[in-house]
Amino acid sequence: MFLGYSDCVDPGLAVYRVSRSRLKLVLSFVWLVGLRLHDCAAFESCCYDITEAESNKAISRDKAAFTSSVSTRTPSLAIAPPPDRSMLLSREEELVPWSRLIITKQFYGGLIFHTTWVTGFVLLGLLTLFASLFRVPQSICRFCIDRLRDIARPLKYRYQRLVATV
């Protein structure tokens, strides 16, 4: 039953039997969630792909736009200039060059993100496998029914004795 061809998987070995529709539903759900997570991770990594020169160009462009707009507006409507980059960094981040910091954040952020969702799907798959292998839902229900029966049996006899004495 567990090692060999199954009707739920066409070309290959089946670990446990599930209906074809349920298998397709679970696989499509896992595929869609994985695709969505991959898109989010790709988007985040694109956001971090900025070199030091590009960020300096953007800052100088913003400063130039700010100085040109300040002269045409009244001081009460002027927007404050962007803060200096050194003010935004913590003490440890100041020691690391800006481009290396971005690459490090991108690498470890992506690594942690992908590791988390891959580990989650592997654990979900193992949980499903062992639940079906050991028939966990049926055994839990059987255990509960047996415990309830053990509790109800003495109560039933007490009730019968009480009714018989009255």
From Swiss-Prot:
Belongs to the RL11 family. Interacts with host IQGAP1. The keyword GTP-binding does not apply. InterPro entries: Herpes_UL5 (IPR016497). The keyword Nucleotide-binding does not apply. It comes from Human cytomegalovirus (strain AD169). Keywords: Host cytoplasm, Host-virus interaction. One of its GO terms (cellular component) is host cell cytoplasm. It comes from the Viruses. The lineage of its organism: Viruses, Duplodnaviria, Heunggongvirae, Peploviricota, Herviviricetes. May play a role in rearrangement of cellular cytoskeleton towards an efficient viral assembly and spreading. This is Protein UL5. It is found in: Host cytoplasm.
